[in-house]
């Protein structure tokens, strides 16, 4: 296919036009007085959002050269979202500022490769500065502040802080769409997996259609149980002790299932059978998790263990097991805490080593089930459009709080970036020529978030930037109340990881744009007009 090529200044200007179209669309959402953007969807109602990465993903431009510029900045937003989960608008804005300032200098004859070196040195100094001023997250209040700022909503902030407190940092918090108007939090204590009872005749509470067994024994196996003779010796031991039994197996069917149900209906013996969670290797790992949590053993041929030889000592124990139609919850397993900690450490190391996002997500779920529990935030609103917008904000806020726990918090509202300017300025003494210009480009870009937040609030950005620069470190501009405050004391905070990732990703892509000398794109095909209409077939109505 034939290509069209642009060179030098013309190529860079085309990329810049694309960058500006995307960044100008995204940057109106920044800050407490930022506006929303409406995205047209081919199906269903339009989507209203102020999430930078969601907006960026929707943008495709007609001109192929401009579109390349837009796609490059889209990568800044996506990468920042992947690493930190928030700060995508800030990252896009910083990339635009670095590209704008950089291209001015390239047009004036600066060497792009030296500019790139200067930019890299300045960014390293800024990242060091951010690490130095970051503060550890202390308790629930700090988490609520981070989440409130990210979601622009104090109620959501409190909700996320509650969830984080209940399920600990290793727990999993999921966001689901609710059927009701309100947004609420549901905590699942203990280990939950998505398999329910094999037969509804096993329920102990017919009103709620669930089986609740207190202090039961738990048989964990990867075998299929169809012959009652296999487990008869074990059942006799349990009946003698007057205990209840939960069976977690590949399946329970035929004669074995019938016998268990008859005994349950007669009231001689209570037993609930549940299919094992997961598939393949993941099933084996999850059964092992359950065994460690409950202090039992997985009865599997891999270890040479047979069902008919199983004794009560090989079974797991728990304070309570609750089995619903599609879920099973094991509360307070009787496993050895040291063994559980070992298992948690092993899963954590697997999370660090894996390269697959899917595997990582599944490992995180397993970790949460062993370590803390699962919290579900049910998002409700009057309309579907509002609910989707709210769900996006909650997901962003969740990611921001996790980032804050990892690397601490810094003053929000773009203040932290202005506060590291003196540290970056020291780099000027160590460089010269075009490298020095590269450092100055970053010094100018670091002011951009404060300037944009002020402009979105209808104020003159430059005046506010100068006042923040002249103030003590940590003093910033509260755009919501339009006054200068100590940002951390006022609860206006950003996760250090979000601020750092935004700057690093913006500088990385912007440097690529500055060092571009030619761009190559396909020549758009001219659409041919349709062929002549065919004559109708006779005799057809």
From Swiss-Prot:
Name listed for the protein in its UniProt record: Chaperonin GroEL
Entry function: Together with its co-chaperonin GroES, plays an essential role in assisting protein folding. The GroEL-GroES system forms a nano-cage that allows encapsulation of the non-native substrate proteins and provides a physical environment optimized to promote and accelerate protein folding.
Enzyme Commission identifier(s): 5.6.1.7
Statement: the UniProt record of this protein carries the keyword Isomerase: yes
Annotated gene: groEL
InterPro entries: Chaperonin_Cpn60_CS, Cpn60/GroEL, Cpn60/GroEL/TCP-1, GroEL-like_apical_dom_sf, GROEL-like_equatorial_sf, TCP-1-like_intermed_sf
Subcellular location: Cytoplasm
Family: Belongs to the chaperonin (HSP60) family.
The species this protein was found in: Acetivibrio thermocellus (strain ATCC 27405 / DSM 1237 / JCM 9322 / NBRC 103400 / NCIMB 10682 / NRRL B-4536 / VPI 7372)
One biological process term in Gene Ontology: protein refolding
Entry's Gene Ontology molecular function annotations: ATP binding; ATP-dependent protein folding chaperone; isomerase activity; unfolded protein binding
Binding site for ATP: 29-32, 86-90, 413, 494
NCBIfam families the UniProt entry points to: GroEL (TIGR02348), PRK00013.1 (NF000592), PRK12849.1 (NF009487), PRK12850.1 (NF009488), PRK12851.1 (NF009489)
């Amino acid at each position: 296919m034939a290509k069209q090529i642009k060179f030098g200044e013309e190529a860079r200007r085309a990329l810049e036009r694309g960058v500006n179209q995307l960044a100008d669309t995204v940057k109106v959402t920044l800050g407490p007085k930022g506006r929303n953007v409406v995205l047209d969807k081919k199906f269903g109602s339009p989507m209203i959002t102020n999430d930078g990465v969601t907006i960026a993903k929707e943008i495709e431009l007609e001109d192929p050269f401009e579109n390349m510029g837009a796609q490059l900045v889209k990568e800044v937003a996506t990468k920042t979202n992947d690493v930190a989960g928030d700060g995508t608008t800030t990252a896009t804005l910083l990339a635009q500022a670095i590209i704008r300032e950089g291209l001015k200098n390239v047009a004036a004859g600066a060497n792009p490769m030296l500019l790139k070196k200067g930019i890299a040195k300045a960014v390293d100094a800024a990242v060091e500065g951010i690490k130095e001023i970051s503060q550890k997250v202390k308790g629930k209040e700090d988490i609520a502040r981070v989440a409130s700022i990210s979601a622009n909503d104090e109620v959501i902030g409190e909700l996320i802080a509650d969830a984080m407190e209940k399920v600990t940092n290793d727990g999993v918090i999921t966001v689901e769409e609710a059927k009701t108007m309100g947004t609420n939090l549901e905590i699942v204590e203990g280990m939950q997996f998505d398999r329910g009872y094999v037969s509804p005749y096993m329920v102990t509470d017919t009103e709620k259609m669930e089986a609740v067994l207190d202090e039961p024994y738990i048989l964990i196996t990867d075998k299929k149980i169809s012959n009652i003779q296999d487990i008869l010796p074990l059942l006799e031991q349990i009946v003698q002790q007057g205990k209840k039994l939960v069976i977690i197996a590949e399946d329970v069917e035929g004669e074995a299932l019938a016998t268990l149900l008859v005994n349950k209906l007669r009231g001689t013996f209570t037993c609930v059978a549940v299919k094992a969670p997961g598939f393949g290797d993941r099933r084996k790992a999850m059964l092992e998790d359950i065994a460690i949590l409950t202090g039992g053993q997985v009865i599997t041929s891999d270890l040479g263990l047979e069902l008919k030889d199983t004794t009560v000592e090989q079974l797991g124990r728990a304070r309570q097991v609750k089995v619903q139609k599609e879920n099973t919850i094991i509360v307070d397993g009787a496993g050895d805490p040291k063994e559980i900690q070992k298992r948690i450490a092993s899963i954590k190391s697997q999370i660090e080593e894996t390269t697959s996002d899917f595997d990582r997500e599944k490992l995180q779920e397993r970790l949460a089930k062993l370590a803390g529990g699962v919290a579900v935030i049910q998002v409700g609103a009057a309309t579907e459009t509002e609910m989707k917008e709210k769900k996006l904000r909650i997901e962003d806020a969740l990611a921001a709080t996790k980032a804050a726990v990892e690397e601490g918090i810094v003053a929000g509202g773009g203040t932290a970036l202005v506060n590291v300017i003196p540290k970056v300025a020291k780099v000027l003494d160590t460089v010269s020529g075009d490298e020095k210009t590269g450092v100055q480009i970053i010094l100018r870009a670091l002011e951009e978030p404060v300037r944009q937040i002020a402009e979105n609030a209808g104020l003159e950005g430059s005046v506010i930037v100068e006042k923040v620069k002249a103030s003590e470190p940590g003093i910033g501009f509260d755009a919501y109340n339009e006054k200068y405050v100590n940002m951390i004391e006022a609860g206006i905070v950003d996760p250090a990881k979000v601020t750092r990732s935004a700057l690093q990703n913006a500088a990385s892509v912007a440097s690529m744009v500055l060092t571009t000398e030619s761009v190559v794109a396909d020549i758009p095909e001219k659409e041919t007009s349709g062929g002549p209409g065919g004559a109708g077939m006779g005799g057809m109505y």
